[in-house]
Swiss-Prot record:
This is a receptor for the tachykinin neuropeptide substance P. It is probably associated with G proteins that activate a phosphatidylinositol-calcium second messenger system. This is Substance-P receptor. Residues 1-32, 88-107, 171-196, 273-283 are extracellular. Residues 366-408 are annotated as: Disordered. A lipid is attached at C323 (S-palmitoyl cysteine). Keywords: Cell membrane, Disulfide bond, G-protein coupled receptor, Glycoprotein, Lipoprotein, Membrane, Palmitate, Phosphoprotein, Receptor, Transducer, Transmembrane, Transmembrane helix.
Length: 408
């Protein structure tokens, strides 16, 4: 897979070499240049502004610095980078049909944007796995801030390794209509095994595998949060936390589905192009259309966050409070409350739930001891320190010492 417009120029190069000429077949008329200029400019502006605001909302507010949001910062940075370093260059390349930037940037242009695509999808995968551990296995250790940063570094390292062949084999070829940046694979045109193997490998690692992992994780999460009945304490606060947890999962499912839809035509196109080269007249317009769809994935996430998350919405309203038709509302929603207050409130709520559970357990044991002596089971939701629902887990009614340990 190639992340830039050099794919169309690969076909132009191969065709012109076979015909013994050096004429660029993909010169565009002015009206097409104008349309693509507007289309790609929208992506760049919305993506850069939106993702920078997302990073600011999370980094500048302590209340937003959670494991999931750290990965969202990484995702926003990857998408902003892809928009800045890839979309802008493709825009100018499509207008002038000439590579002005030399061999070094040709290699970087093929290498870094693909690294960003890898990082984007694996950041989503990390978020899905973190949500899975938090909700399905709440008693297991969670990622710390340091561990999260290490995972992010591992994701980028893996992304750089996977994108290395694109940077290594990128080359500049002089043509009469202008230089082109293309991938000069070591095998011949008749035997394109290197390219074909790489395309299939990338398709599996950047699309199929992570989406399978994400799909399985959110399936189990959905079964826990929606399919399971929530017994026990029916306080408003308790159910508000469950609803909040569901909203986060819904938001991330929308983000992943958007990414999958935007990038599917792009991956299919490159697989087909690898197996059968296309040099038809409509090739360039078709390529630019699916490239625009793929690149547009970088601008949707900030919009999704703003629509589906209250805190992100507050942050966006605060940034655009200068607009006459936007009411900023209460900016304090992003600020951190007193840590002592939050801990006290959480502890009191947890103690109340523990006392209710223990009382219910003892009463149940007294009633059933005369009949069969069997211990009953009940479903309870373990709560995190901030009051959010962690998971539905089974606890034996006769293990009252478990609750005592948690209380301590």
């Amino acid at each position: 897979m190639n992340s830039n417009i050099s794919a169309q120029n690969d076909s132009a190069l191969n065709s012109t070499i076979q015909n013994g000429t050096k004429i660029n077949q993909f010169i565009q008329p002015p009206w097409q240049i104008a349309l693509w200029s507007v289309a790609y400019s929208i992506i760049v502006i919305v993506s850069l502004v939106g993702n920078i605001i997302v990073m600011w909302i999370i980094i500048a507010h302590k209340r937003m610095r959670t494991v999931t949001n750290y990965f969202l910062v990484n995702l926003a940075f990857a998408e902003a980078s892809m928009s800045a370093f890839n979309t802008v260059i493709n825009f100018t390349y499509a207008i002038h049909n000439h590579w002005y930037y030399g061999l070094i940037y040709c290699k970087f242009h093929n290498f870094f944007p693909i690294s960003a695509v890898f990082t984007s999808i694996y950041s989503m995968t990390a978020i899905a796995l973190d949500r899975y551990m938090a909700i399905i296995h709440p008693l297991k250790p969670r990622l710390s801030a340091t561990a999260t940063k290490i995972v992010i570094c591992v994701i980028w390292s893996f992304s750089f390794c996977m994108a290395f062949p694109l940077g290594y084999y990128a080359d500049v070829y002089p043509m009469e209509g202008g230089d082109i940046c293309y991938l000069n694979w070591p095998d011949s045109e008749e035997n394109r095994k290197y390219e074909q193997v790489y395309q299939v490998l990338v398709f599996c690692l950047i699309y199929i595998l992570p989406l399978l992992v994400i799909g399985c994780a959110y399936t189990f999460i959905g079964m826990t949060l929606w399919a399971s009945e929530i017994p026990g304490d029916s306080s408003d606060r308790y159910h508000e936390q469950v609803v909040a947890k569901r909203k986060v999962v819904k938001m991330m499912i929308v983000v992943v589905c958007t990414f999958a839809i935007c990038w599917l035509p792009f991956h299919i196109f490159f697989l087909l192009q690898t197996l059968h080269e296309m040099t038809q007249k409509f090739y360039q317009q078709f390529y630019l259309a699916i490239m625009w769809l793929a690149m547009s994935s970088t601008m949707y996430n900030p919009i999704i966050y703003c629509c589906l998350n209250d805190r992100f919405r507050i942050g966006f309203k605060h940034v655009f409070r200068w607009c006459p038709f936007i009411r900023a509302g209460e900016y304090e929603g992003l600020e951190l409350k007193s840590t002592r207050y939050l801990q006290t409130q959480s502890s009191m709520y947890k103690i109340s739930r523990i006392e209710t559970t223990v009382s219910s357990v003892l009463n149940t044991n007294d009633e059933e001891a005369e009949e069969n002596g069997k211990s009953s089971k009940r479903l309870s939701l373990d709560l995190t320190s901030n009051g959010s629902s962690r998971s539905v887990c089974k606890t034996m009614s006769d293990s009252s010492s478990f609750y005592s340990n948690n209380l301590a």
